[in-house]
Amino acid sequence: MLADKTECISRSELEILQLERLKKIVAWAYERSVFYRRTFQSRGVVPDDIRTLADVRRLPFVTTEELHSVDALDFLTLPLSSIIRINRRDEFTNLYTKGDIRANVEMMIRALMAADVLRGSIAGILGDFADSRFLDVLYALESIGATVVPLGTDCRRWSDMIELFSLDTLISTPQLIMQLQKSFELPFTKIISLNTSTIGNDLQTRTSAKVFSLFAPPEVGHAGMMYRCADAAGHHVQEDFFLIELLRFGSDEPVTIGDAGELVVTALTAQAMPLIRWRTGQAVRRMGDLCTCGREFIRVATP
């Protein structure tokens, strides 16, 4: 297994790190974000109320509807002069600091290496770089030392580029992968799919390549929040960057390990646009056993 040390730290060490980051992000959002200060005050919550990880339940939820209807600048914690990237995808705007981009790339490096994308891999990126997730993929591939071939979105060029450079890995969205598959037999050994609405792996039934799906909804602003490892048993959650809860739909009650619940996400390090207790609407269950790959991060799977 190729993994960084954080993926393998003990549960107790990880929870200490999560609590430290949770306290910081709650204080940061309260002090800097118009939206979160307003919602925290309406709930009667202040940053000092967060003393344990369980205290995250004191905080109000944010819904997908709110994320899409509230002005992005109300979530913003910094002046635009501190923002180095703005991306709009699926009618949702993300803003990033240098630190946010660095975290994105670190998470993507882990996700790619978990899929056995290594130095010497030849990876094609099929997509429009106006979708900034592909920029994170590009930077991560270059950091690993893989050879990168941007394929763009012009389907007339795809087959020539793929054959010319003998690509072994394809990274794209499910929609573009299926579009390519309609006109071209996919020669890759690995396909990495950036999924927005489900963490499922439906593409695996359509190709002989090994498919690694990532959960990458636009609201999160990261392409690698959850990733499959080479053992392909559920999705690892990047727990040093995200705190997740699995709750009964329509309530604040947690489900027991093994039962399906609604995925609720808190981003622990997002600087420009904090994301605290987002109810995703995605049903998942936590897998109770440790993964055979050796990573300590918990895994989730669709019911």
PLM segments and residue spans:
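Nucleotide 5′-phosphate-binding alpha/beta core
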Residues: M1-A114, L118-R119
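Active-site glycine/GP-rich loop and adjacent strand/helix microenvironment
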Residues: M1-E13, L17-Y30, V34, I144-P303
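Redox-cofactor binding/interface segments in oxidoreductases and associated redox assembly factors
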Residues: L78, R85, I125, L170-S172, ...
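Glycine-rich phosphate-binding "P-loop"
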Residues: L95-G99, S143-V148
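Short glycine-enriched loops at secondary-structure junctions
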Residues: I101, D128-A130, Q175-L176
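Conserved ATP-dependent adenylate/AMP-binding module captured primarily in the ANL superfamily
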Residues: V105-I122, C155-L167
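Conserved AMP-binding loop of ANL adenylate-forming enzymes
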Residues: I109-A146
